[in-house]
Design a protein with these regions (language model features):
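Glycine-rich, proline-tolerant flexible connector loops at the mouths of alpha/beta enzymes
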Residues: 6-22, 218
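Long, hydrophobic, well-ordered secondary-structure blocks that form the structural core
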Residues: 77-100, 105
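Histidine-acidic metal/acid-base catalytic patches
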Residues: 29, 46-51, 55-61, 66-76, ...
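A short glycine/small-residue-enriched secondary-structure motif
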Residues: 33-48
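Glycine-rich, histidine-containing beta strand-loop boundary motifs that form or position
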Residues: 7, 37-39, 77-82, 210
Length: 328
């Protein structure tokens, strides 16, 4: 009966008041459900960049953790993906059984980067075959389809940016000049240095969502994409409130990730899970797949099994359940 939701109407970096949280709880409860996990409390670009209003935003984030805890909500998902958060190129990809799902195609994303975003040097990230296919794809789109394609990438999927235009994305990208993976990891550590003590005080957990897709995009570093990233993160901030939202869909989209190995190695840090399966193709594209399917020989029934084991363990002074959401 539990659900994952967020207060999407509140601007990034602002405080979630007890009143707003309670109002959403009441709405959820009116359907016989319980809001027990936040997905997500967004981390502002200022925090990721440690510029502008980042100090105020961090203080507001701490207060939001306190206010959520006061309302009994202690599972908090967040991500540290720069600029565009989650990325897909097709929000209505049709499967053979007639159902629809989400898809990422590197050729289509190349068309976005090169012809719409016009990112300098984007061509260097693609093969000649991909560049030729991207040009052909872009030329196949008329004006309306081009605009719809642009919006599907920058303003529709879960990392909704509330009406950004392509020029805004260019300005956001420019702010990351000189920010490499090492520096972004330092910014994540400094953010966690501030918020984890508050989470510990109230028995809350901060669960980072893996990068989706789990590889660099737009020339930007992604720092929660592979096992070594999480090893570094937990070593830098060993607090028991520092956890992962183990998203099988995001992680499996990177063929460098060994999902069973990561599940076994990180199980002490897994407090929340997204049980999704992904079909990865040789051309680098991937799409959502039914969760009863197999990926690379991995039986996803092992994840609920690990969930049951986790429920038997005591963490932060009490038993905690590993949460799951419907596939998406």
């Amino acid at each position: 009966k539990s659900v994952f939701t967020s207060l999407h109407q509140i601007s990034y970096g602002e405080v979630w008041s007890v009143e707003d949280i309670a109002a959403r709880q009441e709405k959820v409860a009116s359907y016989g459900l319980e809001w027990d996990t936040v997905e997500s409390v967004p981390v502002s670009e200022d925090i990721k960049l440690r510029s502008g209003d980042f100090e105020r935003h961090i203080e507001n984030y701490k207060q939001t953790i306190r206010n959520l805890a006061a309302c009994g909500i202690k599972n908090i998902i967040y991500n540290f993906m720069p600029v565009l958060d989650w990325i897909r190129t097709d929000l209505h990809y049709r499967l053979p059984d007639g159902s629809r799902c989400l898809r990422f195609d590197p050729v289509q994303f190349a068309a976005f980067e090169i012809y719409l975003l016009k990112r300098e040097g984007a061509e260097k990230n693609y093969t000649q075959a991909q560049l030729e296919a991207a040009e052909k794809f872009f030329e196949s789109l008329d004006g309306d389809k081009r605009k719809a394609f642009e919006r599907s990438i920058i303003d529709v999927f879960p990392g909704c940016k509330m009406g950004l235009e392509i020029g805004d994305v260019r300005k956001m990208l420019a702010k990351y000049d000189g920010i490499d993976a090492a520096k972004l990891k330092t910014h994540l550590k400094l953010f966690l240095d501030e918020v984890l003590p508050v989470a510990e005080e109230f028995g809350s957990v901060m669960a980072i969502h893996p990068d989706d897709p789990p590889f660099d995009v737009l020339g930007l570093p992604r720092i929660a994409s592979r096992f070594s990233d999480f090893q570094e993160m937990f070593a830098a901030n060993p607090s028991r409130s520092n956890t992962i939202c183990f998203c099988t869909g995001s992680l499996s989209a990177g063929l460098h990730n060994d999902i069973p190995q990561m599940l076994d190695a990180l199980r002490e840090r897994i407090y929340i899970a997204h049980l999704r399966s992904t079909q990865v193709n040789l051309d680098g594209s991937f799409y959502e797949r039914k969760t009863d399917d197999f990926l690379l020989g991995y039986d996803y029934s092992r994840v609920p099994e690990a969930s049951w084991e986790k429920q038997q363990m005591k963490n932060i002074g009490r038993k905690r359940a590993l949460c799951a959401i419907p596939p998406r």
